[in-house]
Amino acid sequence: MRKNILFITSCLLATTTFAENINTLPKDTTKVIDIEDVVVIASPKETGKLRELPTAVSLLSQKDMQANQITTLKNVSSLVPNFFMPDYGSRLTSAIYIRGIGSRINTPAVGLYVDNIPYIDKSAFDFNFYDIERIDILRGPQGTLYGRNTMGGLIKVHTRSPFSYQGTDVKLSYGTKSNYRSVSLTHYHRWSDCFAFSAGGYYEGSDGFFRNSLNGKKVDNMEAGGGRIHAIWLPSENLKLDFTIGYDYSDEGGYPYYYTGAIDGYDKENEKYKNYTGKISYDQDCTYRRGLFNTGLNIEYQAQKFILSAVTGFQNLNDRMFMDQDFLPVSIYTIEQKQRLNTISEEITFKSKNNKRWQWVTGVSGFYQWLHTTGPVNFMEDGVTDMIEGNINNTFKKIHLDNPRTPEMSLDVLNNRIRVSGSFDTPVFSTALYHQSTFNDLFVKGLSVTAGLRLEYEKMSMNYFSDSNIDFDFFLKMAMPPLNIPFRNLNATPLLEGKEKNDYVQLLPKLAFKYDFSPANNMYVSITKGYRSGGYNVQMFSELIQSDMQQKMIEAILNKAPESMAGMIEGMIKQHMPNYGKELNVQETTVYKPEY
C-alpha cells in the first residue's frame, strides 16, 4: 500500500512538473526528481512533531549517517552543533557534552534512549550503529518528561523497522591507516500485514594508530561484534507489540596515554622519568573488554481518545578494565576494575490523540539497577618503594629537619607487592510521576503554551569493603645518647567496611511559550529544570585506604614501642600529620549530591 501511494504521488508530481515547464524547458533537458521514503517514528511521550517542539532538536536520518560515516555516537560530534563526545581511552570512557554540560565520571548529564528504552549507565553508551534508522538529539534540559541525568540534553536512537523496509543490507568497509575492517548484514522481512522481523549482526576490527615506544606494538587495537533481532506484531488494528534483543561484545587495547613530565612545584631538572616525556612507554598492557546485552518490549494500545504505551527494558553489562596507571616503563601500580551491572526499567504513559487544541501526556516510570564493582589496586616493587614506603619516610625526614634534636625515624616495607582490594555494591532505585500539557492557539492563532511537572524519587546505597596487609620494619635512631632501636616484623591491616544510604526527591517543572509564524518557522521561550543524580565516587577509596594505611602502620609502631617512647613518637607525628588520629569520613569523601 505504501509503495502504491508513493508511486501515485510520484506520477502526480511528475505530471505537475511537466505541465508547468513544458513550454520553458529545453528539449534536451532531463529533470530527475528523487523522493525518499518517509519513515514515521512515534514517541510514547512527545505529543507533536519533534521539529515543532519548543526545544533545540537535531534529527539525523540514515542517509545523513551513511553520508558522514556515522558509526557510533562519538562520530556525531562532527555533525551536530553543541554536541561533543571525546574519542579517547576506550568504550568505557563515554562522556557526552551538550552545550558544555556533561560528566566525565560517575552519572551522566546527558540521557540516552534506544528504541524508547533508557540506557542508565554511560558505560553502555558507545556501541555500533549498523542498523540505526534515525538519531534525535534534543539540546537543553529534558527533565520533565525524561527525568534524571538529562540536564544537558537527550539522545534518542531508533533502529530500523521491518515494516517500513524489506530486504537485505550488506555493508563492507576498509581503512588502510589502521587496517580498519567492518562488515554487517541485516535481513528485514515482512511476513504478513501483522508480523515483521529483522535479524542481523556485525563485526569490526582495527589494528590501531598509536605505538608503544618500548616494544613497537600498537596499543589501541580493537575487535567487536554483535547482533540484534527486532520483531513487530500487530495482533489487532489498535495494538502493537515491538520486541528487540541484542548483544554486543568488544575487546580492545586502550588508553594510549603518555607521561607529560613533572608538574609545577617539582624538581624538573632532576626529574626521574624525563626521558619518557611525550612517549607512550608503559610496560603493562592496557585493555578493556565488555559484553553488553539488551532486550526490551514496547506495547502500544490506541484507544479512541488516547494512546497507552508500556515500555519494559532490561540491560546486562559485564566488563573488565586493566590499566597500567603509572604509564611508565616502571612497576609502580596497576588497577583491574570489573563491573557487573543489571538494570530493569518500566514506563507507562498515556497521551492525547486527535486533539489539536489540548495535547497532554501523563506517565509513571521506574527502574532498579544492581551494580557490583571490584577495583583492586596492585602496588608493584617501585610503587611500594616510592609511594608507600617513600611517602611515610619523607614525612619522618621532614620531622627531623624541622627539629634536628628529634630522633631520626624510618621504615622498610618487607612486601615486594601490596594489593589493596576494593569491592562495592551500589544499587539504585528510582520512580517518577509526571504530566505535561500543551494548549495550542491560545488567545491568538499560532500561540501555544506548554506546562509540565515531574515528581521523582531516588534511593541509593553503597556496601563497601577495602583492605590490605603490610609487613614492615621500623627504625629509631637517637643522637643523645647514640642509640639505634629497630622494631622488626610489624604488621598493619588497613580496613574500610560499611554501608552508606542516601535518597532524594526532585520536582522538575517546565514552562514554554511558542509562536508559529508558519508551519516551518517558530519562536519559543522555554524554562526547564534538569538535574544530574547523586551517587558514590568509588574511585576516592584509593585515597581513603592509603590514609588508613598510614594510620594503621603508625598504630603498629606505637603498639610495639615502649610506653615511654610511644608518647614521644606520637607527639612528633601529630605535629606533621594533622589528619592522624581522625576518623575517616567515608560519606563526605565519596558521596556526591545531585547537581541542577
Task: For the regions a language model picked out, list residue spans one by one.
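Extracytoplasmic beta-strand/coil segments of soluble accessory domains associated
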Residues: 74-117
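Outer-membrane beta-barrel translocator/receptor signature
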Residues: 94, 108, 121, 130-133, ...
